[in-house]
């Protein structure tokens, strides 16, 4: 009897570890993953429990945020790591890195009237500089956009086309002593220059209304501006969390990710606790199944400061390793209170920016998810404003979902998705009000099920998916070479 029990124990152990040559994909006693079965494992109560957990990490510390390198984010990273490690289903690692954190505050007045301004992170400081205001043409992305008399002045620039960092650099090249960027959509504007640059000048953001008013004043007379920017800088150690299924073909990796950090201003529960918990919920549900292709989940750090964690990760892979990643799915803000179901425009049909080969197929898959349920959806552009940026620059097919940030919802969109016209998709975007109460439960549940739908599809098979061409070491697709490399979310305000 003892020998029989010993034999049985050895057999069970062998099965649980996977027998090389007999069951290459592991977990033979589990059913093969299907779209319906994985979606059925997604429960709203599990999603909201995770959302509440992230809120608790913010609440536990005086900063009341989960900004990278801070205590709230450290708690987030440890929890994600431990939760996944405990499943036994994943090989989990923390990828350590050091990045420069920046926090800036601005005060701005024009002709003695105070304006509500936000300093761009990584802005050089300004000690109450006073100068005449001039207005850049177009979007301030080219040297020819700046008036000949820009030297020694503060320049007003409209948001759009290029990054805030490039606008600040162009202003510096034109010998301006400061730059004020105003929004091109209703609402205030806070953003980042994406990093330090000697060409940058002190830079602040203004609302569309205030910016247009200033431009009108300049057109009719002289405007004197006083600008003060206080900037703090600190090198901080932080981590990505990477979890890859032990089972599945590790030469055909399906990868998905979401950033785990917040801005300084608040806990970041929609931005991007929603995406973080969405993929976490799917990762836990996936442990009930076996699969054919390995699935790699990533929680990126320091996205809000220039996509730093995802860029660090992609840069750490040579072309041979990156070629194993057959596609990348990005989920950034999937629980917006005034949501719209938006899918990255992989085929370029809406925004004339086509993703690498395979991106169109990803878009079509998500379209099918919504179409099969009779639900509306719309495309959203590949702007480079989220963690997919580093992947598409290296020709990795990408796609994903987004429910909206600072952009105002139109009456036409209300007819499709409900909600309130004239109000931002997320009125608490990048603010202290981005709490649990900011989450639209219907939106986050639907989009998490969509994540499960896509993961099950590609974990089972990549049949019909375009084959990735092999390229040289660290080759960058020239179509995306000038895409901004810093920011905070698809929504990220660095451009």
UniProtKB/Swiss-Prot annotation:
Entry protein name: Leucine aminopeptidase 2
Listed GO biological process terms: proteolysis
Primary site of residence: secreted
NADP among keywords: no
Binding, Zn(2+) 2: 271, 304, 430
Gene Ontology MF: a single term: metalloexopeptidase activity
UniProt GO cellular component terms: extracellular region
Organism: Trichophyton tonsurans
Sequence similarity: Belongs to the peptidase M28 family. M28A subfamily.
